[in-house]
């Protein structure tokens, strides 16, 4: 799998990603997204659904809980998130932490402990009501390089985008491995884009949240991982022109193969 070779994560994670087999014997009927604004901005669940439909597959029921800025631990106390999990009968459940949470976890033991324990508890609760659910951890992306030029940068998320992405990859990989879940490498595709000769601006002006083109890229990767499609090329591309859509499809294919 290219992601493990290209980005050279720790050896155990490389083996995990290389050997992870397709997890879905049939198309899922019910998909749940639990996250925050990185899922909610541009309505990723709806974009994912459009990508699925335009591929000619039966559209699943898709629901979500995406209150802004929430950590995995906070979702355990959010009635809306817990109600959806307890509804049960989910085929796929996507879990996404606060955008800086896994990066801060690298250097902050308390944040790391909370992240690991909360991920495990969410998985436990999902499986209590949906025993056959495939759980996906949504690897998000580093801040835009301009974030590090600001006078006030906030908590320690790494010295630059490369270090921040490495932290996100590592800790989402850890919780995926520890909880027998799927790792969805959206952030790695963003990194490929920004390392390319003519990168597309995927971040909004806040250097954090996704433009629609970034959300489209994420949706392609979710489609590819959940449906075991190595080269996602849906007919639907929303507001993107054909050239942009094909470019994003290429980045998605690189992390899916």
Model-derived features: where do they sit?
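Conserved SGNH/GDSL esterase-like catalytic core that processes O-acyl groups on lipids
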Residues: 28-32, 38-122, 131
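A generic secondary-structure boundary signal that marks alpha-helix termini
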Residues: 22, 57, 227-231
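Bacterial N-terminal signal peptides
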Residues: 10-22
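Conserved catalytic region of serine esterases and O-acyltransferases that act on ester linkages
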Residues: 179, 202-257
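Alpha-helical cap/lid subdomain in secreted, periplasmic
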Residues: 82-208, 212, 224, 233
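N-terminal secretory signal peptides that target proteins for export/translocation
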Residues: 1-8
